[in-house]
Every structure is written in structure tokens, then in C-alpha cells.
Amino acid sequence: ADPFALLTVDETALVATPLHGVASHLFELSLGSNSRGTVGTGVGQSYRDALKYPELALRVGDLLAPDLRDRLYAVRDCIANYVWPVLLDAEFLREDSADVRYELELLRDDGFVEYIARRFREAGKLAHIVPHDYLAETILRKEGVAVIESSHGVLTDNVHGFTPHTSAIRTLPKQSRQLLDDAGYTGQVVNLGVTRAYAVRHGAGPFPTGDTTRGRHLHPGSESQDNRYQGQVRAGALDGVLLRYAINVCGGPTAFDGLAVTWFDQIKRDGEWLLCDRYGGELDPAAFTPQGELRVRQEPTEAQQALLTAAL
């Protein structure tokens, strides 16, 4: 069977290019030992660039455009212009020197741009590219169930996550719900929160229940997933404090119809299910309530959100 025959892609979807991935890698390397963490595929960087340089943004509908090659060169030149000043002021780790040289060579290599153009054209021919109204006019008119999944975890939200270890986008369920509202959908909606039966974090950032002795058992093969950009895969006990915080920033328990807890098969193999319900020690009253729960920031107004977006 042809898997691409089952795949439809909105023609207005933003395209993250490998050039944005190079920018993401270089920015992460420029932080030295102060890792922020990045998937490194350029998704967040392409979103930021689409806001700052909308005339250069590539959409899925552009993959077969006659001027695709020229537009990729324009994207490359733009990235080179904003990356270079950052690199001049950066204090790279000595052990990152080879990686920095490699990424810069890619950015200078016209052959790399030509390769991207070829592969993008191939992808454009394989993918079933559909109009933006396909969700409303086709998918939501079918019998059955449509599953809408957010692309990021709640705690990577750029307002309620833990700066600077956040995504460039908003990741709350209401962003996914907006897709349905924009499509004019008025039928039944079931909201499910989803979490693993244990905590896992890929890369830098706070991880109160992280346990280096349990990562290999809870997440087999995770040690082979390490890279310089995302960092180490860490695992630990399911964190009730962070789970309740994530639920609360989404609107509280009443915002959900249920909570799906996954990966119990791994817990069974590990032989022990560890849960954290409260943090010990003295907690910062500015961040925690007297009951030991994380305080939820107020949602930004439209004007405040515009400022946050402009600062990305």
C-alpha cells in the first residue's frame, strides 16, 4: 500500500526547511553550556521567520512552484544575514567547533540548496496537497471520528511553559479547538488530556522527578537518541505537580472529558510505578500556592500576545 495515498496536506501549511534547521543548530551551539534545547528540525525557526519575513515564507502549495529554487536561495540568504551577527558574539564550546564548521558549510553550499529544491519537488509530487477548506468540506463531513492532536506538549507553551525551554508557538488545547471553530464545526467534541505513566523530558530544562538511574529502564533505547541539540532523554516518576499545572493552564479539570494515561506496558516491565504528588523543601511563594501547587499565569490579552509574538 502507498502510505502517501492516505496523507493529505493543507496547501497553506508552513514549510520548515533544512536551512531553518541549520539556523536552529547554530543558535543552540551559540549558547555554549547554557543549553536551551531544540528538536533541531527548524519548525520553530520557520514560524519565527514567517512572522518577521512573511514574503519569504514557503507554504506546502509552493513545493511545485516554478520559482521554488529561487525562493529557497532567498531564504538561505536571509538566514545567513541574521545568523552571522549572533555567531560573531557567541562563545562556542571547544568541543562544538567541528559541528559549527559543518553547519556553516551547509549554509554556504549552493549544492545543499539545490538538493533541498529537488527533494521538495519530490515531496510535492508524492503528497496529496489539498485546499485549506478540506478540513471543513471533506474531513468533518464524513461519518466517524476525527482526531485532532496538538503538535507539542502543554508545558512547552511559550506563555505557560518554563522560559527559555519553550516552543515558539502556543500549545494549549484551545489552539487545536480553534481549527474546528474556524471550520464551522458545531458537532460533539470530546477533549482528552494525554500523559505517559511516567515523566520524560528530551533535552534541557527543569525536571524535578528526573532520575538518571531509571531512564534506561523506563525508556529503553533512549541513550541512543541523544544529540547535541535536543540533549539527553531523561525519565522519572510521574510528576503530579506538573500534571495538575498543565491541566490548570488549559482551564482546569472541567476543560477535559478525561485523561488518557499511556505506556503502562513499560511501567509493567519496569516493575514499579512511582508517583510524585508534592515537592519537598521550601517552595518559592511567588511560584507556588500555600498548597504546593504551581501558580498559573493569567492569559495574555490580545495586545500582550502580540508583543510576545513580536519578541520571538
Indicate where each model-derived feature is located:
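Non-transmembrane, aqueous-exposed alpha-helical and coiled segments at domain scale
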Residues: 1-312
